């Protein structure tokens, strides 16, 4: 019976080989050849756990497709990072790129494109900054904002070394230094409302004219203009020395008259005092009016006013002609 068992049939009626699928490490072609080389009785044609030829072909096609995708992604990465590798002096053939998944390859390509765009934007900004001297740009939270720069010149006494320009705002000095192109030092001021107000001011004498003070303002005030204090120049006063309001008292008993000389065109504005003087005594007023000196002065004033008016002469002549009898 042992002899019949050994020689009667080509293989054992019970196949002891267990095939649960392809190993992820083994090549699909090798697994396929192994399945084909097995005896017919050991293939388990009806068993659901065995691998058929159709399933092997499908797996082989998937592996080929993934290999092709990896090859294309490797070429894209090589094109994107080829310039950086050449600048660093590295040899790409020494260390071949590792296979990456499609998701990671797309993410890297998107990041590299964003990096290239940011570099181009920075280079264009640096090139344009050399041509524009009146305005500067500052990056804040990923956005570019325009900073207003203005310059004001004031005529001062050459012996004055205070480097103070009175413009109506309050400033705090935080530094001073000497520059190469000007022997006069440059003073740095910050608005008194800082840090809420970002305006800064630089004051320095002109290198050509020592009596000219140049003030450079950076930024715009985000608060209303404070009221000018007594004795300070207004912000919009023109001219070399400016002008100040003055109070003139004509006499001790009369009203106080304020002359505002800061108006354009030399106009003078008369402003009466807020508190009027006490009313005069009626008896004294009546005595002054009844005096002959007052009457003489009144007649002279009226005569001078009438004779100075060119229309008065014509009206007087017309009235006289109407009263004359007709000849």
Swiss-Prot record:
InterPro entries: WRKY_dom (IPR003657), WRKY_dom_sf (IPR036576), WRKY_plant (IPR044810). Pfam families: WRKY. GO terms for molecular function: DNA-binding transcription factor activity; sequence-specific DNA binding. A motif (Nuclear localization signal) lies at residues 106-112. Gene3D superfamilies: WRKY domain. Residues 56-76 form a coiled coil. Keywords: Coiled coil, DNA-binding, Nucleus, Transcription, Transcription regulation. Residues 114-126 have a biased composition (Polar residues). Its main location: nucleus. Residues 160-226 bind DNA. GO terms for cellular component: nucleus. It is found in: Nucleus. Residues 88-134 are annotated as: Disordered. GO terms for biological process: response to bacterium; response to chitin; response to fungus; response to salicylic acid. Induction: Induced by biotic elicitors (e.g. fungal chitin oligosaccharide). Induced by pathogen infection (e.g. M.grisea and X.oryzae pv. oryzae (Xoo)). Accumulates after treatment with benzothiadiazole (BTH) and salicylic acid (SA). The keyword Nucleus applies. The keyword Lipid metabolism does not apply. Transcription repressor. Interacts specifically with the W box (5'-(T)TGAC[CT]-3'), a frequently occurring elicitor-responsive cis-acting element. Regulates, probably indirectly, the activation of defense-related genes during defense response. Modulates plant innate immunity against X.oryzae pv. oryzae (Xoo). Belongs to the WRKY group II-a family. The WRKY domain is required to bind DNA. This is WRKY transcription factor WRKY76.
């Amino acid at each position: 019976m042992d002899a019949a068992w050994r020689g009667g049939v080509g293989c054992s009626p019970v196949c002891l080989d267990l095939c649960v699928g392809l190993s992820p490490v083994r090549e699909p072609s090798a697994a396929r050849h192994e399945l084909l080389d097995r005896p017919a009785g050991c293939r388990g044609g009806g068993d659901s756990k065995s691998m058929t030829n159709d399933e092997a072909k499908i797996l082989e096609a998937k592996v080929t497709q993934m290999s092709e995708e990896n090859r294309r992604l490797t070429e894209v990465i090589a094109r994107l990072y080829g310039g950086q590798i050449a600048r660093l002096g590295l040899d790409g053939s020494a260390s071949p790129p590792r296979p990456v998944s499609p998701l990671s390859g797309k993410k890297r390509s998107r990041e590299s494109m964003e990096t290239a765009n940011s570099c181009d934007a920075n280079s264009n900004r640096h090139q344009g900054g050399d041509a524009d001297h009146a305005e500067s740009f500052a990056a804040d939270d990923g956005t570019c904002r325009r900073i207003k720069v203005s310059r004001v010149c004031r005529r001062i006494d050459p012996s004055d070394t205070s480097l103070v320009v009175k413009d109506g705002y309050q400033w705090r000095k935080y530094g001073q230094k000497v520059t190469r192109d000007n022997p006069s030092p440059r003073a740095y001021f910050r608005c008194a409302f800082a840090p809420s107000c970002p305006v800064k001011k630089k004051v320095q004498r002109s290198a050509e004219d020592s009596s000219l003070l140049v003030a450079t303002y950076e930024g715009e005030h985000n608060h209303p203009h404070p009221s000018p204090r007594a004795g300070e120049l207004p912000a919009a006063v023109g001219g070399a020395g400016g002008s100040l309001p003055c109070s003139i008292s004509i006499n001790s008993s009369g009203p106080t008259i304020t002359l505002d000389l800061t108006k354009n065109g030399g106009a003078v504005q008369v402003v009466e005092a807020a508190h009027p003087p006490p009313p005069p005594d009626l008896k004294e007023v009546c005595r002054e009016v009844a005096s002959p000196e007052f009457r003489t002065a009144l007649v002279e004033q009226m005569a001078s006013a009438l004779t100075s008016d060119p229309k008065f002469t014509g009206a007087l002549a017309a009235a006289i002609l109407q009263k004359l009898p007709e000849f």
